[in-house]
Amino acid sequence: QDASLHIQYVVPQAGTSVKLGEAVMTFYGPLDNTYRYGRAQDAPNLNTRQVNKYSIVTRIVYGSNSFLMTGDAQQETIKKIVARGYDLSAQVLKQPHHGYQDVRLQDKPKGRYVYDSDHKYLIDRTGASIAIISNGYKNVNQTPESNVLRDLSGMDVYQTSDKGTIVVSSDGKNLSVSAQKGGNVPSHAGYVVKQKRTPLMQKVTVQANTKKKMTPLRSDASA
């Protein structure tokens, strides 16, 4: 810290909030008090994964609009936040960790890597309609990974790798998205699979031309 700048700083605590004008930002994480500032200061053994676990996670509410900002949070961090019972609903989700499938090596033999992404339990709880993924120019790391993109399929997904700078604006009621490239056209358009109503098995009585009475079953799709 540069004392000559005379800037007061506060270390946020999970569960506390600050006002940003008329918006309110609530801190959900990190939930671990062993955090060390910087990648190596006072903790030379911290690797990138450990540092990412201490990403600040916040929920911002402005009027009727809400945003969930997750930084580079890893699955351990997100699971702790989910377990706390925080309100995770949001219209806009900043997808954790660039859209990586950051499964741990010990989880791979269990088959988790093949199906759900690490943060599906978070994605399902947000109910978001817009997802933002920060990934590198030319996307050499090929994110988001397929599992993540599949779990985000109900949202409009915007990636910085092909959209450049992405701005989501709110007036407290309405949201708008603009990007450096391609305007408001998403990188991947979301879709919602309409659930088909289950056909009902209806019992009907049929009077035959004979003296016998038949009571067959028929399948009627409800209107």
What does each model-found stretch correspond to?
Residues 78-165:
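Cap/insert and terminal regions of metallo-dependent hydrolase folds
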